[in-house]
Design a protein with these regions (language model features):
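Sec-dependent N-terminal signal peptides
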Residues: 4-12
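N-terminal amphipathic/hydrophobic interface segments
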Residues: 19-583
Length: 583
């Protein structure tokens, strides 16, 4: 009997409202352009929104355009979705509802939207939720002020600013679209993604919840929150958030430990600190005022080291010069100071076919090691060092820089040390001062070689001149050849002055008429002009292959003396008496 009475009351209410409709016609809703129906050929017929339950049914001419509204525990259904609210205004003819207060929309695939207000169109299956909107699905939660929801395309969109939380990261953006089927968030404009370790900031991103990956389509920065100076920048790339791996494809940089790696295509692993670059690679170290360019590079953030290959070269800015170095491979690394382990020293190593150019000095070797902090440069395996019209070779050469003015202070040559200096740089005469021995130390003054100390089987060949104090005319005395345990030689503009020749000293000056040209050079004389870099670009090739200078040998006096000597020898020979044979 009670059930019959309830049905009777509902039918009576509908009948009464129907009669009222004839007297006070209902006003259709004012719809947002979002609800405009698209012309879709062969589209399936739409279903009508159904009212399932409410505590009361009402209609007032001065409320909601005279349309029915339902109050108290209201429930409507449409195409598998359930809408509940405190009040729902039902525009029955337009198949449209407006829900007010504690609105909840649950879809058939488990998505849940809560809001203070919501409009839903049964014709387009689209809804607009407003005020304290939260969309929850198994992968994430979206919070915003206004959310546009399309059940047909299964997308949710906002442009009034919102946050997305997946339990691991919180994302903020002004505008985003959530593609529910593919679990993909597309952010347009500025966005921020925050988790416990990193912050991602940029423009335009597609973030996939199923795989926890992100594709970048605009300027993007990924910052280490524990160390904000370490960050990654790109304008196109991919971020694997679970693996903490980043692939960078356009205008990309990796900032780590005060250094910057750039390249055409790059990769970085946040867990291991390993990164690499391919194509137009550049490694900048602003603290050391040095950068390295090459075709390929790797960095090891936790070891604070890096490697650059594929025709690499390094450029280091000094206070009064610039050092250019090329090789087949470069390594850079930091190492704790042996005295104070709270400080680190910076090292640069180069391997295979090393070439170096500075304005005042040039060098070649098989490999190189540079302690940049202490200013010590080591050349290994067949090193050769040029400075002005002077050349030094040996088994190993060490260059020591003044750390204040960054000029060369001295050189140490270990094993088969050999220094050669052109007697007169303004002429093409084949005349060279030479000093050699086991060990050699060369001291610099104003970036020029000034003094050489040679220890162990020290030998020298120098050209001796005399100068008239009045006329300043210089006359050649001859060639001085010395053999000592130790030699100190002073380099001057046009000569080497032997300051000391100690321990078993033997020496003699030979007039030019009494020393053959081949005796004026040591057997291992190796003056090299073909491989010397004359400009910084020369280091970019294995050898500049300069045209070798052709020096003129001045042997006039020696030849004349030889002619006289040979004539004298001829005169001293006994004469042979010819005898006639008797028949």
């Amino acid at each position: 009997m009670k059930k019959f009475l309830f049905l009777f009351l509902i039918l009576f209410a509908h009948f009464s409202l129907a009669q009222t409709d004839k007297i006070n016609p209902k006003t259709p809703p004012t719809k947002d352009i979002f609800f405009k129906k698209e012309n879709t050929p062969n589209a399936a017929p739409t279903q009508k929104i159904k009212q399932i339950h409410s505590d009361s049914i009402n209609r007032k001419p001065d409320l909601y355009g005279g349309n029915m509204f339902f109050d108290g525990n209201v429930e409507f259904q449409h195409n598998g979705a359930v809408l509940t609210a405190n009040r729902v205004v039902f525009y029955q003819k337009e198949n449209f509802v407006k829900a007010i207060g504690n609105v909840v929309l649950v879809t058939s695939d488990g998505n849940r939207i809560t809001a203070e207000e919501m409009e839903y169109d049964g014709e387009t299956q689209r809804g607009i939720a407003r005020k304290n909107v939260v969309l929850t699905d198994p992968k994430q939660t979206i919070s915003t002020d206004v959310l546009y929801y399309d059940r047909v395309k299964n997308t949710a969109y906002f442009n009034s600013g919102g946050t997305i939380n997946d339990g691991k990261s919180t994302m903020w953006t002004q505008a985003a679209t959530y593609f529910i089927d593919s679990k993909m968030n597309e952010f347009t404009g500025n966005y921020t993604i925050d988790n416990a370790q990193y912050r991602v900031e940029g423009k335009n991103i597609k973030q996939y919840q199923s795989t926890n990956t992100a594709d970048f389509f605009g300027p993007t920065t990924i910052t280490n929150k524990q160390k904000p100076s370490n960050y990654v920048y790109t304008e196109n790339g991919k971020y694997l958030m679970n693996q903490k791996e980043v692939y960078l494809n356009k205008n990309s940089r990796i900032h780590y430990n005060g250094k910057i790696l750039t390249g055409d295509k790059m990769y970085y692993n946040q867990l291991t600190g390993f990164g690499k670059g391919e194509g137009n690679v550049r490694l900048d170290d602003p603290k050391e005022k040095r950068y390295i360019k090459g075709g390929y590079g790797e960095i090891f953030e936790k070891k604070d080291s890096a490697m650059i290959t594929q025709k690499p070269y390094a450029v280091k800015e000094l206070k009064n010069d610039t050092a250019y170095i090329a090789a087949e491979k470069f390594l850079t690394y930091q190492k704790p100071d042996s005295i104070d382990n709270t400080k680190k020293k910076s090292f640069l190593r180069a391997y295979k076919k090393v070439r170096m150019y500075m304005t005042k000095a040039q060098g070649r070797a098989d490999s190189l090691s540079f302690n940049e902090t202490d200013g010590v440069l080591h050349f290994f395996r067949k090193p050769i060092f040029w400075s002005g019209e002077k050349q030094i070779t040996g088994d190993k050469i060490e260059a020591y820089f003044n750390t204040e003015n960054e000029n060369i202070d001295s050189l140490k040559v270990r094993g088969n040390a050999f220094a050669i200096s052109k007697v007169d740089s303004l002429t093409m005469k084949d005349e060279f001062h030479q000093v050699k021995g086991k060990l050699m130390t060369v001291f610099y003054q104003n970036n020029e070689m000034k003094l050489a100390k040679v220890i162990g089987n020290a030998q020298s060949i120098t050209y001796a001149d005399s100068e008239d104090q009045k006329t300043k005319k210089i006359d050649r005395l001859g060639v001085s050849i010395s053999n000592c345990g130790e030699i100190e030689a002073l380099f001057e503009d046009r000569k080497i002055q032997i300051l000391a020749c100690n321990i078993g000293a033997q020496g003699e000056i030979y007039p030019m008429s009494k020393i053959a040209p081949e005796k004026r050079k040591f057997p291992d004389y190796n003056w090299n002009t073909k491989d010397r870099p004359l400009k910084w670009e020369d280091i970019l090739v294995d050898t500049p292959n300069n045209e070798e200078k052709q020096y003129e040998t001045d042997d006039t006096l020696f030849k004349k003396a030889e002619e006289i000597r040979l004539k004298e020898e001829e005169k001293r020979k006994p004469k042979t008496i010819k005898r006639d044979r008797k028949l």
